[in-house]
């Protein structure tokens, strides 16, 4: 297992934070993670979580969890609960109670009135379509709204009537009065408040006007005393507006915004809209489908919090973009599970083996280590006359280099004896349904005298093994860039039809019968697996493949 070639991980924010503390600019660092509760967190959010919580922890500060809940039509308590669970699962805890932008709606409203009284905000009656036309483009300046010069008194009256619910959705908006000719389109009189007659999951029906993200964000940071407001690069052009609001309002603190490059992972989609489409159109079983890029999907697949944190450390934090190879994430989980997952044997495609020269009623309880390096104890495998091996480990006409069982050939059973294939029993269609073999009783734990046995295969006892279901998960998309389709199709056209193969009737060693939900294993010679957190039951386990033993994608 070799580590992927990557530049040394860096974090350009560390020296900034250190300098701010050393200079006395801040006595304590306070960061925040501010998700919008309109979907489940995905692997891209993990980078932001690890960055914000990680910096706070490293420098002895605090990190707030604040829900940016300014768009009630798209938000839901389900998402709030899932986000809290995901952050804690990753190993982080926010300072105090979780916070909501809606906690500050009264203060934000008062600050909007402050801007109106200062002549820096006005109520605009342009429709959304008209407002887009007046806004101009990247190459053309905008045009002032015909409502821009309303008096302070008229604006105060109209804003109060907006708040009172007098007007329908979209009829009016409160806008900041900045500069319609600014080369930065975010400064062309941005919207502060929209009319939305929508029930809010936190405030109920108290409000029918809701603040915009840009008006909410910086002021929420200021209220909470955030010292370093860290967001992704697409908000770099919003920073002048962030600073304009702070400069023109009587806020209690002056946070500073910093931007970093978001995580772009190949073979992966992180657009919430597209993830929701996958769920709604039943291309996957839900937000926690193990093929999804959501944290709940990775968790159900068997990824550990440590592997995701280590992955985020590996890729570092910088301002340069680029696409990260998903092989780095797969390396992180392989490295973790290789070190920490107990070993077990599971036969995915069982073929019965009868050892004809083994005593009829004899059973030997063989002890095998649960881990080759760590002291995890042993598990017991009963060995008797009938066992199962994988059907792929026997070939009547073997290809070149085949080192497993062939007619008349020998192979070692893992932790057990050497057996020889004597006869293949077939059904009427010519399918092999049973092997008759003989064993060498002098080969338990040692090589046979005078001959070399190269192959080692896994096995389970026939009588004591437990039947189980195994789900072989693979990458959901077959293209490294699933968003891009050469023929102009949809990202859905890139779905990998082999991203899930369900195998029923698999046979697992007895120690796996009561595997706990989310318990992780290396199935020897097969890969890393975990017991499904929803469907696996005592005596009827269901295992999800987390990742293969080695990277075989595209080989």
Curated annotation (Swiss-Prot):
A motif ('HIGH' region) lies at residues 35-45. Keywords: Aminoacyl-tRNA synthetase, ATP-binding, Cytoplasm, Ligase, Nucleotide-binding, Protein biosynthesis. ATP binds at residues 36-38, 42-48, 232, 262-263. It comes from the Bacteria. L-glutamine binds at residues 68, 213. A motif ('KMSKS' region) lies at residues 269-273. Disulfide bonds: none annotated. Belongs to the class-I aminoacyl-tRNA synthetase family. This is Glutamine--tRNA ligase. It comes from Stutzerimonas stutzeri (strain A1501). The lineage of its organism: Bacteria, Pseudomonadati, Pseudomonadota, Gammaproteobacteria, Pseudomonadales.
């Amino acid at each position: 297992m070799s580590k992927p070639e990557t530049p040394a991980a860096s974090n350009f924010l560390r020296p900034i934070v250190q300098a701010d503390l050393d200079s006395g600019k801040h006595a304590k660092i306070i960061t925040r993670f501010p998700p919008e509760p309109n979907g489940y967190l995905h692997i891209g959010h993990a980078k932001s979580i690890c960055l914000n919580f990680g910096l706070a922890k490293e420098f002895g500060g605090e990190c707030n969890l604040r829900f940016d809940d300014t768009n009630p039509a798209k938000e839901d308590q389900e998402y709030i609960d899932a986000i809290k669970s995901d952050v804690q699962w990753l190993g982080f805890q926010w300072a105090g109670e979780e916070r909501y932008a809606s906690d500050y709606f009264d203060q934000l409203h008062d600050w909007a009135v402050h801007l109106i009284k200062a002549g820096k905000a006005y109520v605009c009656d342009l429709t959304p379509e008209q407002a887009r036309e007046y806004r101009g483009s990247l190459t053309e300046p905008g045009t002032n709204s015909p409502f821009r010069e309303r008096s302070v008194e008229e604006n105060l009256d109209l804003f109060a009537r907006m708040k009172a619910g007098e007007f329908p959705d979209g009829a009016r908006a409160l806008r900041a009065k900045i500069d319609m000719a600014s080369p930065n389109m975010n400064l062309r009189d941005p919207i502060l408040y929209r009319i939305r007659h929508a029930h809010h999951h936190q405030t109920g029906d108290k409000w029918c006007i809701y603040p915009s993200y840009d008006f909410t964000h910086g002021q929420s940071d200021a209220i909470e005393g955030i010292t370093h407001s860290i967001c992704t690069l697409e908000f770099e052009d919003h920073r002048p507006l962030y600073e304009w609001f702070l400069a023109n309002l009587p806020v209690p603190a002056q946070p500073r915004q910093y931007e970093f490059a978001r995580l772009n992972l190949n073979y992966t989609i992180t657009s919430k809209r597209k993830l929701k489409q996958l769920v709604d159109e039943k291309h996957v079983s839900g937000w926690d489908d193990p093929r999804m890029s959501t944290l709940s999907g990775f968790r159900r697949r068997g990824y550990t919090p440590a592997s995701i944190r280590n992955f985020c450390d590996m890729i570092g934090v910088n301002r340069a973009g680029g696409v990260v190879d998903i092989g780095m994430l797969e390396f992180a989980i392989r490295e973790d599970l290789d070190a920490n997952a107990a070993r077990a044997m599971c036969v995915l495609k069982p073929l019965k083996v009868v050892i004809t020269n083994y005593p009829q009623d004899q059973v030997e309880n063989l002890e095998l280590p649960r881990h080759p390096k760590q002291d995890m104890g042993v598990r017991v495998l009963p060995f008797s006359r009938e066992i199962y091996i994988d059907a792929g480990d026997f070939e009547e006409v073997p290809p070149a280099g085949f080192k497993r069982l062939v007619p008349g050939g020998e192979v070692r059973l893992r932790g057990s004896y050497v057996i020889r294939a004597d006869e293949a029993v077939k059904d009427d269609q010519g399918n092999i349904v049973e092997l008759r073999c003989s064993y060498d009783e002098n080969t338990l734990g040692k090589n046979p005298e005078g001959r070399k046995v190269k192959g080692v295969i896994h096995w389970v006892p026939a009588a004591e093994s437990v039947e189980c279901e195994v789900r072989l998960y693979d990458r959901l998309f077959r293209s490294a860039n699933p968003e891009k389709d050469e023929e102009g199709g949809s990202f859905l056209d890139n779905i990998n039809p082999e991203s899930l193969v369900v195998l029923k009737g698999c046979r697992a060693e007895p120690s796996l019968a009561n595997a706990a939900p989310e318990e992780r294993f290396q199935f020897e010679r097969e890969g890393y697996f975990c017991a499904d957190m929803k469907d696996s039951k005592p005596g009827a386990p269901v295992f999800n493949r987390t990742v293969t033993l080695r990277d075989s994608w595209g080989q």
